[in-house]
Amino acid sequence: MQKNELEQKLLQEEVSKDLYSLKGGLPNESYCFNEQNGVWEVYYSEQGIKSNLKTFNSETEACEYFYTSLIEMLKGMGVI
């Protein structure tokens, strides 16, 4: 899965865009996906801090991890 496919899957699942960022950065209380210098990052951003940072050398692995982790978290919270 590539980033554009990830975005489409999240739209199909009707996951609110307020809950995640596929552009990285440090939005408050968002699950984030970012590429920096060929390394893909997945993390939770809260109050300007990257929490639970995971790094990947593969976009595919990062996308799959992001999707699975975000969906599991949202199901656990009863959001979806």
Language model features with spans:
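A short, charged, amphipathic alpha-helix used as a generic interaction element across diverse proteins
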Residues: T55-M73
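Surface-exposed loop/turn and secondary-structure junction residues enriched for glycine/proline
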Residues: D18, Q36, F56-E59
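Intrinsically disordered, low-complexity segments enriched in small/polar residues
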Residues: D18, E29, E41-V42, C63-Y65
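Short aromatic-glycine-(Arg/Gly/Cys) micro-motifs in beta-strand/loop hairpins
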Residues: G24-S51
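Intrinsically disordered, low-complexity charged/polar segments
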Residues: Y20, M73-I80
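Short, exposed beta-strand "edge-strand" segments with a Pro/Gly-rich flavor and a Y/T-containing core
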Residues: M1, K50-N57
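Negatively charged, low-complexity tracts enriched in Asp/Glu with abundant Ser/Thr
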Residues: M1-G25
